[in-house]
Amino acid sequence: MRIPLLAPDNYAFPDPAYALARCDGLVGVSRDLDAGRLLEAYRNGVFPWFLRDGWFFWYAVGPRAVIVPERLHVPRSLEKTLRNCSYRVTVNGCFAEVVAHCAAAVRPNQDGTWIAPEFQTAYLKLHEMGYAHSFECHYPDENGKTRLAGGFYGVQIGRVFYGESMFALQPDASKIAFACAVPFLASLGVELIDCQQDTGHMRRFGSELLPFADFAERLRMLNAVPLKEEIGRREVACKGL
């Protein structure tokens, strides 16, 4: 199989439909992970999956797992935790720390992390540009001081939030962050959350599958529409939970 090489001076991607027709979803490989290439990738439903031998591998997945915010489902067991737990959820409180924790997280059936230092640097650049955001869940320690317990990060373009990775240092911490983040993002105008892959974890939150063509069409419409208000840096209330 011939792998498309992405030109360093051109951020355009081949049509993901061809990659999906081959069943592997590999859109192309590049030597760079520039902010401009990342943004163009997300706009087209493509994301960087891993780094191997100096090459970044870019993929599209279809059907695509997404969450429509107004159809968010909070599992009953998590609802109880949300009511009874003394936690705080913030947005953009410690982006670099969240990404570092995601990179260090041990995951089933994975020998290592895909979030190599090059990825961390690239997403930190997107954060500085106002595109990448983190949500953090804080728990009080034995002295009553709140400490980071879990969270996740992703990329926001227009009215789409592209989820990337989660971590939890304490049970349910990343789930709490996510359950609070979705209504918050919806209040600012986010209409679609990209979960990339179909997982049991996201299905518990109400994810659904879109044919890739439908997903790409929604991206074309929603990426061009600005939010009602910038995400900023603040505490996030778990409204309606």
UniProtKB/Swiss-Prot annotation:
Presence of the UniProt keyword Mitochondrion in the record: no
Gene Ontology biological-process entries: protein catabolic process
E.C. no: 2.3.2.6
Catalytic activity: N-terminal L-lysyl-[protein] + L-leucyl-tRNA(Leu) = N-terminal L-leucyl-L-lysyl-[protein] + tRNA(Leu) + H(+); N-terminal L-arginyl-[protein] + L-leucyl-tRNA(Leu) = N-terminal L-leucyl-L-arginyl-[protein] + tRNA(Leu) + H(+); L-phenylalanyl-tRNA(Phe) + an N-terminal L-alpha-aminoacyl-[protein] = an N-terminal L-phenylalanyl-L-alpha-aminoacyl-[protein] + tRNA(Phe)
Coiled-coil stretches: none
InterPro entries on file: Acyl_CoA_acyltransferase (IPR016181), Leu/Phe-tRNA_Trfase (IPR004616), Leu/Phe-tRNA_Trfase_C (IPR042203), Leu/Phe-tRNA_Trfase_N (IPR042221)
Highest taxon in the source lineage: Bacteria
Cellular location(s): Cytoplasm
UniProt KW Iron keyword: no
Keywords, in A-Z order: Acyltransferase, Cytoplasm, Transferase
Family: Belongs to the L/F-transferase family.
HAMAP family: Leu_Phe_trans
Protein purpose: Functions in the N-end rule pathway of protein degradation where it conjugates Leu, Phe and, less efficiently, Met from aminoacyl-tRNAs to the N-termini of proteins containing an N-terminal arginine or lysine.
Protein name per Swiss-Prot or TrEMBL: Leucyl/phenylalanyl-tRNA--protein transferase
